[in-house]
Amino acid sequence: YEMLRSLVGSEMCIRDRDDLLALPKGDKSKYVLQTLEYIAAHYADADINITTIARSIGISEGHLSHVFKKETSYTALGYLTLYRIHMARRLLADCRYKVYEVAGMVGYRDVAYFGSTFKKLTGLSPSEYQDRCR
């Protein structure tokens, strides 16, 4: 989680248009790029998993897992978590939404799990983070 935590904290993006977070340099295969695009478009879906991602781009779960990890140093689901927390930070900083609303907006059904994941990656609870943005 330390690697994810530092990446979430940096808030660097590859492309603002898609809000893709910074990844290790180097060319990415079409499967990795398609996975990043899929995550950017569907991160709010609480049912997203490696199976739905792999099916959407037409490859096996095993191949997707291998290629994504090799090219990014993250698992696809690890990146999904990272992306969700990145988007949650943006929503919490806006201050228009309550923590439970943000949790649902970024794909978490369980607010407590969202809170513990957020704190693990940012060092602050969602409400502490939001208070600092006011």
Kindly label every feature range from the protein language model.
Residues 1-14:
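Single conserved hydrophobic/aromatic residue that forms the stacking wall/gate
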Residues 15-34, 57, 70-78, 82:
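Short, Lys/Arg-enriched, Trp-marked, Pro/Gly-tolerant hinge/linker segments that flank
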Residues 17-24, 36-48, 68-72, 89-98, ...:
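Basic, amphipathic alpha-helical hairpins
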Residues 52-59, 64, 68, 102-109, ...:
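Append "Primarily bacterial transcriptional regulators
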Residues 70-109, 131-134:
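Terminal helix-turn-helix DNA-binding modules in bacterial transcription factors
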Residues 116-134:
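…primarily DNA-binding HTH/wHTH and HhH modules…
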